[in-house]
Amino acid sequence: MVRAIVGANWGDEGKGKITDMLAKASDIIIRFQGGSNAGHTIINDYGKFALHLLPSGVFYQHTTSIIGNGVALNIPYLIQEIESLVERGVPKPRILVSDRAQVLMPYHVLFDTYEEARLAGKSFGSTKSGIAPFYSDKYAKIGFQVSELFDEDLLREKAYRVCELKNVLLEHLYHKPLLDPEEIIKELLRCRDMIAPYVCDTSAYLHEAIKEGRNILLEGQLGSLKDPDHGIYPMVTSSSTLAAYGAIGAGIPPYEIKDITTVVKAYSSAVGAGAFVSEIFGDEADELRNRGGDGGEYGATTGRPRRVGWFDAVAARYGCRIQGTTEVAFTVLDVLGYLDEIPVCVGYEIDGQVTREFPTTSKLEKARPVLTRLPGWKCDIRGIKRYQDLPENCRKYIEFVEKEIEAPISMVSNGPGRDDIIMRR
């Protein structure tokens, strides 16, 4: 059975913890899109980890972790991430890398950095991990597929062709040093030697695994509002963040995805620029930010303070809908225990009209939040294991959110640890 775990909002919802928890009963965990531009934070018996390329199931010895064809594969980064786990006492995970994945090159990071600097105040808030240049090259058909690393003649011809194109931009747009094709070839061969032990036809491997009835998790990165088609364009990432893309990015039939667990945060947070209707500021924001997450709301990749706001039911309902949600994991609920009352955004006012539908970006930028307030529970809920043992106002908050987002909440996370979870269904 194949289950996808995805985010409903901007990312940072707590997908890593939910994947880590569900991986216990899984055989295979797959990253199917994105790259090292966003981190999944996990706290377990080995310590606290921020994974960027590895799937969040790597801490279980019985699992196989797959880097799918849809991933932006930074090979040195992946190897470093594997080695850092082993250095901290984690048994070396079993990793497979799709021979159809494409390689994120050092020049992708350079171009990302140069473009953000060129755009200055109009930049997209990139993590400067090379993601947009990587996917641009992939769809312009000038990327390097992992399988191509093992054909030196092809690499050489392609490296010279790519450098010819890139150097025009470097010389005339960015005014930066030119690429040396021989250095690019050396880097590609170095990457080949590092990745060779892990490479296989992962689509064929998954085909057999599905026939055998093995349990498979697709782990998404970021969330619905960062999708390039359905998100807050252009303040989006460069690969699809939807569960539907899991079939493409992993190389399996779409009808095999039976369950879609969408992770929804009990309040809102985002890294980077773009419209954020329920955002709060000042001391109010600082307190929520410092109490939030698993040690404060700061980006796992950049360390930047996350923007924070109240729960946005309009955005979350939309995010769940476009994911095709079958169940919701509701996270970081414990953070809100300090509040006397909890505002929730239930609508947007745009040009004097109130809507419950999530609009396109030009309208979203004019939206003002329509808030309702629920009573807080004013206590620490960590350690509670049964839903009925939660404070009444806490249960009312969960049930209000469930009604607003129109999707069943099956799991409630009430702490940062793997076992801090309440199963409702």
Residue ranges, per PLM feature:
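Non-transmembrane, aqueous-exposed alpha-helical and coiled segments at domain scale
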Residues: 1-425
